[in-house]
Amino acid sequence: MAVREVYLEAAAVTAAFLADPAVADGWEAPSALARMRIGALASHLANQITQVPPVLDAPIVHERISLTEHYARSTWTDGDLDSEVNTYIRRISADAALSGSRVQAGEAMTAVQHLRRRLPDEPADRMIQLPFGPWALTLDDYLTTRLLELAVHGDDLAASIGVDPPPLPAAGLDRVMSVLCAMAARRHGAATIIRALSRAERSPKTISAL
C-alpha cells in the first residue's frame, strides 16, 4: 500500500476521531501531555492534516535531505519541554484550540477531502518544503513524518479522554514503527533495542525514541 494511500486513510480516521464528543467535552481539561490541555493536543493533532495542503503549495527553497537526516536535525526530539521549539508548538496549539473542537475537526475533514483529490495526481518524485526546519523532503517522506505524528498524538489524545486510540491502517503503523525503531537505535544503540525486544532479563529501562 503506497504511503499516500496510507496517509489518506490514517488522516480520515483521525479526523473522525477528532469529532468524538469526548474530545469536545474535555477540551479545557489537562491532557496526557505535560503543559497541554486536551484542546491544544487535539489542535496539534489536527494540524498534522491541515498543514499538508499549504505545504503542497509552498515553493521549495532549500536542499532535499533524507528522512533519517530529517529526524537527526530535528531539535524537538530531545524531549526538553522548555526548548524553544516545544514551547512554540504548545503556544500555537493553544492558540488554535481557541476556535473550538467543532472547527478543528471540521477543518481536518475538509483537508482530508481536498487531499483525496490532490495527492493521487502528485508526481512520484514530488518534493516539498517543510514549514519548519530549513530543508526539503520528498512528499512521501513528509507524509511518513505526518503518519508518525498521527499515530503518536492520536494515542496521546485517546489516553487523555480514556478511550482506545483510533484504528490507523496496519501499513501506516508498520511505517511508524520502522521509523521509531530506527530513531531508538540511533539514540540507544542497536544492541540495546535488540535486547529490549528479545531478552526480558537484559531489557533496559527505556528504549524511547523521543
Protein language model regions, located:
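Structured surface interface patches that mediate subunit assembly and partner/cofactor docking
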Residues: 1-16, 23-34, 54-84, 88-210
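Conserved catalytic core of Hanks-type protein kinase domains
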Residues: 17-20, 44
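N-terminal interaction modules that seed assembly of large macromolecular complexes
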Residues: 32-45
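DHp/HisKA dimerization-phosphoacceptor four-helix bundle of two-component histidine kinases
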Residues: 43, 47, 145-148
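N-terminal amphipathic, basic helical "cap/leader" segment at the start of enzyme domains
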Residues: 46, 51-56
